């Protein structure tokens, strides 16, 4: 039996290690991105149901809806690209969001305004978003 030994240069070992590390990194990134997408889908579905339960249910009172407006706005800002909306609906919602935020930022004697009513444009935006998530 012959004892032959293969001698590798340090350069070839280094290249092989780098290639192996890059391959492992790509596999890990692929797994993370894939699971992140799944979590994002599940989160989107759960939040959509939550929005529809509050804003799509006629038995929910207007005060509960008003209290949940920040949740609706956060949902829209995070997931607006996933909602099937026409350009006109998108413009209408964006205008309503700006109007709502401007109203919320108004201060009376150094304190944010409390209470208030939901204007027709905000009600329209809510109905468009609810229709899109159902």
From Swiss-Prot:
Induction: By a variety of stressful conditions including bacterial infection, heat shock and exposure to ultraviolet light. Pfam families: Turandot. This is Protein Turandot E. InterPro entries: Turandot. A humoral factor that may play a role in stress tolerance. The keyword Cytoplasm does not apply. It is found in: Secreted. Belongs to the Turandot family. Residues 1-38 form the signal peptide. One of its GO terms (cellular component) is extracellular region. The keyword Acetylation does not apply.
